[in-house]
Design a protein with these regions (language model features):
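Conserved N-terminal entry element of GNAT/NAT acetyltransferase domains
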Residues: 1-25, 167, 173-175
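Acetyl-CoA-dependent GNAT
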Residues: 17, 24-25, 36-101, 112-113, ...
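Hydrophobic pocket/interface hotspot
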Residues: 30, 34
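Short hydrophobic/aromatic beta-strand or adjacent loop that forms the aromatic wall/cage
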Residues: 62, 164-168
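Conserved catalytic-core motifs of GNAT/GCN5-like acyltransferases
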Residues: 81, 128-131, 143, 148-165
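Conserved acetyl-CoA-binding loop-helix of GNAT-fold acetyltransferases
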Residues: 104-117, 140-144
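Short glycine/proline-centered loop/turn elements that form peptide/ligand docking sites
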Residues: 112, 135-138, 155-160
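Conserved GNAT acetyl-CoA-binding A-motif
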Residues: 119-130
Length: 175
């Protein structure tokens, strides 16, 4: 993956933004993005993929919407049903990662809009996600996308000696 570096032209480049479902060829870029984005502030445990095969087993092609500019992936939105139960198939659980150099350019919002459209097309009735209480920027982003508080798991994690709440949020898909 070519390095995604901060660049004054990032804002202009977003006019070339594309969004599509993930493909096998994206694995390398997505693994690097995970290593960059998920840390103790954004996840209860850093994500460290040991191999491309492991990554593809956990994140098969089509299980993410990826956003890119030219050939570079600058963000993704992963989605899956929370369990294998038939009674849970109307729900997608989400996670979003945007490269730090491409944040606050509307990429996350465009991914979320695309996800809402895809969910409606696929008969999904509810989107949900979890966010650490120590990540106020992510919480504000999800609220700006219409997500509402569903619950709070108090002191759910102990990260670097600090107890952190896990905030549960949801968005209804009107169908």
């Amino acid at each position: 993956m070519a390095a995604l570096m901060p660049d004054e032209s990032n804002m202009a480049q977003t006019s070339n933004l594309w969004i599509r479902r993930s493909e096998m060829k994206d694995a390398g870029q997505l693994m690097k993005l995970d290593a960059l984005v998920w840390d103790g502030r954004t996840s209860p445990s850093p994500i460290a993929w040991t191999s491309r095969e492991q990554y593809l087993q956990q994140c098969p092609p089509g299980s993410q919407l990826v956003a890119g500019i030219d050939g570079l992936i600058c963000g993704y939105l992963g989605f899956a049903t929370p369990s294998a139960m038939a009674s849970h198939r109307h729900v997608y659980e989400l996670h979003v990662a945007i490269h730090p150099s491409y944040r606050r350019l509307g990429i996350g919002s465009k991914l979320m809009t695309a996800m809402k459209e895809l969910a409606a097309e696929e008969g999904i009735r509810k989107l949900c996600l979890r966010v650490l209480s120590t990540n106020p920027c992510a919480i504000a982003f999800y609220e700006s996308c219409g997500f509402m508080l569903q619950g709070r798991l108090v002191a759910e994690y102990c990260i670097e000696g600090q107890y952190v709440d896990d905030i549960l949020m949801w968005y209804p898909i009107i169908g």
